[in-house]
Amino acid sequence: MSFKMNVTTFRYFRPSCFLLFFIGWVALVAPIAAADNKDYQIGDKLPAPAKSKIKPMPSATATVAYKEKTWDDLMPKNWDPMASLKGLNLDKLKDSDPRAIEALEKIREAWNNAPVEPTLNGERIRIPGFVIPLDKSGDKVREFLLVPYFGACIHTPPPPPNQIIHVRTSKPVLKMRTMDAMWVSGVMQIGNVNTEMGQAGYQLKAEWIAPYP
């Protein structure tokens, strides 16, 4: 049975558990990809696609230039998610330790205010990720979150806002399932969107969506 974690659940993490999760998330930022077999495990990122497997865009969008982006590109280069933990020996901290509680509050604040990359505003981008449908009507989806690793917002707490994209489509996407791996292309905009599954720091109006790879 899966444990569904949203933003509300996130508040009730024990300090030591949250700190360990935070360390684990930072490790996920590293470019470690899942094997190319679609049997994704929690925390897996998408493998680099073979060019022969990339689905061509339809003729209506093929002439539009999209810049392919990675999830690292969505984080400013000078942002250090570990800055709040420098000087702390996490192995020796207990839940009742005031330093653990103080560190937890600092991390939550830094996490919720994670900076976005301003140069992406208004860019036409193409990025792969895992989807979390938000307004499913039957087998049709018009709104979803795109996240960088399998299980984000569902089996683990949400990543920081600069690692979540809120996507809207002009036409419904059929038969999209939670944690499907998809290519999404469109115009990126900077702007927070709060959902029950997580806070997105980016918005994207999708012009082309296709299964990954």
Where are the regions a protein language model picked out?
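Serine/threonine-rich, low-complexity intrinsically disordered segments
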Residues: 10-11, 25, 34
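OB-fold and OB-like single-stranded nucleic-acid-recognition modules
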Residues: 33-213
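N-terminal secretory signal peptides that target proteins for export/translocation
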Residues: 1-14
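Extended, compositionally biased low-complexity polar/Lys-Gly-rich tracts
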Residues: 12-14, 18-19, 111, 120
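Bacterial N-terminal signal peptides
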Residues: 16-29
